[in-house]
């Protein structure tokens, strides 16, 4: 496994990469000196390369390749537009890596894409998914076989980071086969849809499938959606609005994720 450290007072230009081989207990150290200040967000390593997503002081999102042997630095300018950011990066094999990119469109909707590159930074292929009048908040793509890929993630209203449902997309030979979306209220037992927990007007909207008209007194913030074997594991937290602070509202989490208890 690999560990990356940022050198103190280096203006985010100097890092230390430690590669640990668990089989041989061999530890290798490499000093990384970047030509520009870059806050490294996520990274993967190959034999002589470290490939990482980063952001600079102008808040531009970058995708970079750095050779730890000859210190050569490559910024893949053509791979990202100003409205795009990398939210995931992984190694496919010894010659190919993959990034998941979230793009904000002019109409304030978001789309998600999966892009594969060779080690020279050349884009090999790309697939993307979007939902009309909706924003994709997060997601990932899973290879089923040599020609089938499934994309799964969370979506919300346009220009919103609050998830309102889950989407499932299927690609055959890199072409969209189908796209389905499900509001959380359509999922069995996601919410307790009875009068003990929900107001009558909300239950009526659920019955009529007027999901976009439902308004809660809390925000619903997704944390992660991951695939484990044949199951999807979803974690999130709710933030309750409090209007009892001099007519100004503050956010109060009613579930403390650190203590594992509900706040009073």
PLM feature segments, named:
Residues 238-264:
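Glycine- and small hydrophobic-rich membrane-insertion segments that are intrinsically disordered
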Residues 89, 111-115, 171, 176-190, ...:
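Karyopherin-beta/Importin-beta family HEAT-repeat alpha-solenoid scaffold
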Residues 32-34, 78-81, 128-133, 178-215, ...:
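Surface-exposed loop and turn segments in beta-propeller and other repeat-based domains
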Residues 14-24, 63-70, 110-122, 163-176, ...:
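Beta-propeller blade signature
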Residues 27, 73-76, 121-129:
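Blade-edge beta-strand/turn elements of extracellular beta-propeller
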Residues 34-45, 82-92, 133-143:
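Repeated scaffold domains used in trafficking and secretory/extracellular systems
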Residues 1-10, 42-57, 64, 94-107, ...:
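Short beta-strand elements that form the blades of beta-propeller/WD-repeat-like
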Residues 137-141, 199-230:
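Signature of short aromatic-glycine-proline-rich micro-motifs recurring in repeat-based ectodomains
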């Amino acid at each position: 496994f690999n560990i990356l450290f940022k050198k103190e007072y280096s203006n985010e230009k100097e890092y230390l990469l430690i590669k640990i081989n668990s089989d041989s207990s061999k530890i290798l150290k490499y000093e990384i000196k970047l030509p520009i200040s870059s806050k490294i967000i996520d990274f993967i390593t190959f034999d002589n390369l470290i490939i990482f997503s980063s952001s600079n002081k102008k808040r531009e999102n970058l995708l970079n390749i750095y050779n730890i042997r000859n210190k050569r630095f490559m910024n893949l300018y053509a791979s990202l537009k100003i409205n795009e950011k990398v939210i995931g990066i992984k190694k496919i094999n010894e010659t190919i890596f993959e990034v998941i990119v979230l793009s904000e469109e002019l109409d304030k909707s978001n789309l998600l894409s999966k892009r594969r590159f060779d080690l020279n930074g050349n884009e090999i292929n790309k697939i993307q998914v979007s939902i009309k009048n909706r924003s994709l908040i997060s997601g990932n793509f899973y290879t089923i076989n040599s020609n089938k890929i499934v994309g799964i993630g969370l979506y919300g209203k346009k220009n919103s980071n609050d998830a309102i449902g889950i989407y499932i997309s299927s690609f055959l030979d890199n072409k969209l086969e189908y796209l389905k979306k499900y509001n959380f209220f359509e999922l069995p037992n996601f919410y307790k849809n009875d009068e003990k927990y929900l107001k009558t007007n909300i239950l009526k909207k659920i019955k009529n499938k007027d999901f976009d008209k439902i308004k809660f007194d809390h925000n619903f913030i997704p944390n992660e959606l991951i695939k484990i074997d044949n199951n999807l594991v979803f974690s999130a937290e709710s933030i309750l609005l409090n209007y009892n602070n001099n007519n100004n509202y503050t956010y109060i989490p009613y579930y403390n994720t650190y203590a594992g208890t509900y706040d009073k």
